[in-house]
Amino acid sequence: MRKAIIAGNWKMNNTISQGLKLVEELKPLVADANCDVVVCPPTLALDAVVKATEGTNIKVGAQNMHFEESGAFTGETAPAMLEELGVKYVILGHSERRQYFGENDADLNKKMKKAFEHNLTPILCIGETLEEREADVTEEVLAKQIKLDLAGLTEAQIAETVIAYEPIWAIGTGKTATSDQAEETIAFVRKTVAGMFGAEAAEKMRIQYGGSVKPATIKEQMAKPNIDGGLIGGASLKAADFAAIVNFDK
């Protein structure tokens, strides 16, 4: 039985003080959660949020990292820096990173491998654009991302990996894939992973849905057999909304 995982991606929102206020509001609301709870603040707030969540059931994730150990990469964050802070998760390949910062699958594959070297659980984002969905090439697009991003990982690493399926057309648009659409696509993702790494690893891997997830939609999504959680954007910026999603089973 896979344990659900709900992760909040704050994106470029919340100063350190605002983030700490949000965490303090959130702590009592999710203390009895039956799922893994992760918050992903901006890089500058990671240290403060890790300290603020010590001794709680809230884990902290980063929104990105570099694939090199160190070096002349101005403005970047090394995996060892995240590990030393006590960060446990890292979002890799978010569609905004792919779209605005030119991230590609070859670099993401390096990042995946580097995350495991530094005890960071990757939340790998994959997804198709509206044009790709309307052209009926969703499965081809996702299969290519999966094959390139996961190449060379071990079965044990695959079992630990979290994939977030985020249809790009549903991010921040208010549009949401129906729960049936999400389930069908996520089942395909799991099948593709099984073809590469075997059914056992694929069955252990947790796959989230991301794309305008709200308290009103989470219950129906989580009732589906292949959906193991959510990567939450806008709704993670309000403690009550995020807690309502985290406590979807109550």
Swiss-Prot record:
It catalyses: D-glyceraldehyde 3-phosphate = dihydroxyacetone phosphate. Substrate binds at residues 9-11, 172, 212, 233-234. The active site is at 94 (electrophile), 166 (proton acceptor). GO terms for biological process: gluconeogenesis; glyceraldehyde-3-phosphate biosynthetic process; glycerol catabolic process; glycolytic process. It is an enzyme of class 5 (isomerase). PROSITE patterns: TIM_1 (PS00171), TIM_2 (PS51440). Its EC number is 5.3.1.1. HAMAP family: TIM_B. Involved in the gluconeogenesis. Catalyzes stereospecifically the conversion of dihydroxyacetone phosphate (DHAP) to D-glyceraldehyde-3-phosphate (G3P). Homodimer. This is Triosephosphate isomerase. It comes from Clostridium novyi (strain NT). The lineage of its organism: Bacteria, Bacillati, Bacillota, Clostridia, Eubacteriales. The gene is tpiA.
